[in-house]
């Protein structure tokens, strides 16, 4: 019997998609109803608490400078924050890597990040739940409950539509 050394890309894609959906089923069930109230330093070393934003929707986005998908997502988060910060929602970007403070400041200026950027060390989970990959975004309701988690990129439109749907239910 001879095994082919050629990779069938269609089968690999099907396997990847199957594993992706399976991981979403496993990880998706770990959303907590009431999050722990985290407190993380921002780029000015001021502690930011999640509970300080009660009364607004909070988009908590875990990201890193080395993550290409995170970088393409940043303009979407900038747009969403700009459109909603004075109304009903804010974005908190949580940098999830070991990076110097000055490097992080330069990076956030270069990408015009208009929302608070908080700092934490990489770990398998956070106060909000598991971080299976980057970017990971949690959506916290005005009451402080985690209502959604997205592993992978989000768009301004997707976030706004989800909030509108939740607000009308």
Tell where the protein language model's regions lie, with residue ranges.
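Thiol/disulfide oxidoreductase modules built on the thioredoxin-like
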Residues: 106-113, 119-164
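Structural microenvironment flanking redox-active thiols in thiol-disulfide oxidoreductases
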Residues: 71-111, 121-125
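Hydrophobic beta-strand anchors of alpha/beta hydrolase catalytic cores
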Residues: 59-60, 91, 137
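Bacterial N-terminal signal peptides
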Residues: 16-26
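Short active-site neighborhood of thiol/selenol oxidoreductases, capturing the structured segment around
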Residues: 50-68
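N-terminal secretory signal peptides that target proteins for export/translocation
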Residues: 1-11
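Short loop/turn microsegments at loop-to-beta-strand junctions
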Residues: 35-36, 58, 134-135
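N-terminal "domain-start" segment that seeds a small globular fold
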Residues: 26-50
């Amino acid at each position: 019997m001879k095994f082919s050394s050629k990779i069938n890309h269609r089968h690999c894609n099907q396997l990847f998609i199957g594993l992706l959906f399976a991981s979403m089923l496993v990880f998706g069930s770990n959303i907590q109803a009431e999050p722990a109230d985290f407190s993380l330093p921002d780029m000015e070393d001021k502690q930011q608490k999640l509970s300080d934003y009660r009364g607004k929707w909070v988009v908590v986005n875990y990201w890193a400078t080395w993550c290409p998908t995170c970088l393409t997502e940043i303009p979407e988060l900038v747009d969403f924050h700009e459109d909603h910060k004075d109304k009903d929602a804010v974005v908190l970007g949580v940098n999830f890597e070991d990076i110097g403070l000055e490097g992080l400041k330069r990076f956030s200026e270069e990408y015009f990040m208009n929302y608070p950027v908080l700092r934490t060390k990489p770990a398998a989970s956070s106060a909000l739940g598991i971080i299976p990959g980057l970017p990971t975004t949690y959506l916290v309701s005005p009451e402080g409950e985690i209502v959604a988690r997205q592993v992978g990129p989000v768009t301004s439109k997707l976030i706004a539509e989800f909030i509108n749907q939740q607000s009308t239910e």
